[in-house]
Amino acid sequence: MLTITSYFGFLLAVLIITSSLFIGLSKIQLI
């Protein structure tokens, strides 16, 4: 149970970091 929870937490963190990086690159390209 703990392994599944930590796995989903890690997956969510990676998704947030990837999306934030993508948004940052998009803003840089717009400028």
Swiss-Prot record:
Tell me where it resides: Plastid, Chloroplast thylakoid membrane
Record keyword Phosphoprotein present: no
Where is it predominantly found?
Answer: plastid
UniProt entry keywords in alphabetical sequence: Chloroplast, Electron transport, Membrane, Photosynthesis, Plastid, Thylakoid, Transmembrane, Transmembrane helix, Transport
Give one Pfam family, short name only.
PetL
Give the record's GO CC terms. Answer: chloroplast thylakoid membrane; cytochrome b6f complex
Keyword Thylakoid assigned = yes
Protein topology in the membrane: Single-pass membrane protein
Q: Name one GO molecular function term.
A: electron transporter, transferring electrons within cytochrome b6/f complex of photosystem II activity
Q: Which residues cross the membrane?
A: 4-24
Record's subunit section:
The 4 large subunits of the cytochrome b6-f complex are cytochrome b6, subunit IV (17 kDa polypeptide, PetD), cytochrome f and the Rieske protein, while the 4 small subunits are PetG, PetL, PetM and PetN. The complex functions as a dimer.
Task: Name the HAMAP family for this protein.
Answer: Cytb6_f_PetL
Q: What does this protein do?
A: Component of the cytochrome b6-f complex, which mediates electron transfer between photosystem II (PSII) and photosystem I (PSI), cyclic electron flow around PSI, and state transitions. PetL is important for photoautotrophic growth as well as for electron transfer efficiency and stability of the cytochrome b6-f complex.
Q: What is this protein called?
A: Cytochrome b6-f complex subunit 6
Which organism does this record belong to? Phaseolus vulgaris
What's the name of its gene? petL
